[in-house]
C-alpha cells in the first residue's frame, strides 16, 4: 500500500503544480469574458480644459500645470485618453486634422514606438494650421488622395481593437464650436470592417500609383 500512496501523492503534487501554473491564464480569460466591451459617446463642442498632464513627453517629470484653464475631464480629454491608450498601432483616416492637442497626442504615440499610419485629404492637408506636415516631419507615414472627390472619412482604430468614429473633424473649430459626436466602440466586427476600409484606401493611395499630371492623363 505504501508505494500506491506514494504514487497518489506524486500525482496529486503534479496536478497541483499544473493547476497553479495555469491559474493566471484562466483568471485572465475569465476577466476578459466578464469585462464589458467599451461603449462611449462623446458630444462636442467640448469644454476647454487643460490637457498638459495627458500630453506629457516620455520621461518628463510630473508637475502641476500653472495655467488658468479648468483641469477637469472634457470630451476632448476623453478622446485624447482613448487615443493615448494605444500600445501597438494607430490607424487614422481623417478629412481635416489641425488640432494641436490631437497632433501632439499622435506624435507622442509615435515617440513611444506605436506604429502610426495616417490617411487624409490632399486639399485640406495643405491648409494653414494642418498637423499633417508636422506628422510627416516626425517620421509618421501619411498618404492622401489624388482625385476630385474628398477623402471625407473621420475614424481612428486603436490597437486593432477599438474604433473611434463620428462627425468630428479633428480641428479646433469643430472641437470648441461645432455640435459633433464621437463614438468609441470596442467591437470586433465593426473594427474589422473599418480596418478593411483603411487598408483598401491605404493601398489605393500608395504614391507609387500616382500620376503627377492627372489632368493631362484625363485629357487623353
Swiss-Prot record:
Its main location: mitochondrion. InterPro entries: PLD-like_dom (IPR025202), PLD_domain (IPR051406), PLipase_D/transphosphatidylase (IPR001736). It comes from the Eukaryota. GO terms for cellular component: Golgi apparatus; mitochondrial outer membrane; mitochondrion; nuclear membrane; plasma membrane. One of its GO terms (biological process) is P granule organization. Belongs to the phospholipase D family. MitoPLD/Zucchini subfamily. This is Mitochondrial cardiolipin hydrolase. It comes from Bos taurus (Bovine).
Amino acid at each position: 500500500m505504501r508505494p500506491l500512496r506514494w504514487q497518489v501523492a506524486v500525482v496529486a503534487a503534479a496536478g497541483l503544480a499544473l493547476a497553479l501554473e495555469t491559474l493566471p491564464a484562466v483568471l485572465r480569460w475569465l476577466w476578459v469574458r466578464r469585462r464589458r466591451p467599451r461603449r462611449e459617446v462623446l458630444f462636442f463642442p467640448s469644454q476647454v480644459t487643460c490637457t498638459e498632464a495627458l500630453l506629457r513627453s516620455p520621461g518628463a517629470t510630473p508637475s502641476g500645470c500653472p495655467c488658468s484653464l479648468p483641469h477637469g475631464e472634457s470630451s476632448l480629454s476623453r478622446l485624447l485618453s482613448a487615443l493615448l491608450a494605444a500600445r501597438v498601432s494607430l490607424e487614422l483616416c481623417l478629412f481635416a486634422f489641425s488640432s494641436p492637442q490631437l497632433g501632439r497626442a499622435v506624435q507622442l504615440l509615435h515617440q513611444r514606438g506605436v506604429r502610426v499610419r495616417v490617411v487624409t485629404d490632399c486639399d485640406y492637408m495643405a491648409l494653414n494650421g494642418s498637423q499633417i506636415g508636422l506628422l510627416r516631419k516626425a517620421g509618421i507615414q501619411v498618404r492622401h488622395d489624388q482625385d476630385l472627390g474628398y477623402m471625407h472619412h473621420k475614424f481612428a482604430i486603436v490597437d486593432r481593437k477599438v474604433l473611434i468614429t463620428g462627425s468630428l473633424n479633428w480641428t479646433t473649430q469643430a472641437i470648441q464650436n461645432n455640435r459633433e459626436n464621437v463614438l468609441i466602440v470596442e467591437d470586433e466586427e465593426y473594427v474589422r470592417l473599418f480596418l478593411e476600409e483603411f487598408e483598401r484606401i491605404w493601398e489605393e493611395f500608395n504614391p507609387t500609383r500616382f500620376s503627377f499630371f492627372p489632368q493631362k492623363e484625363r485629357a487623353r
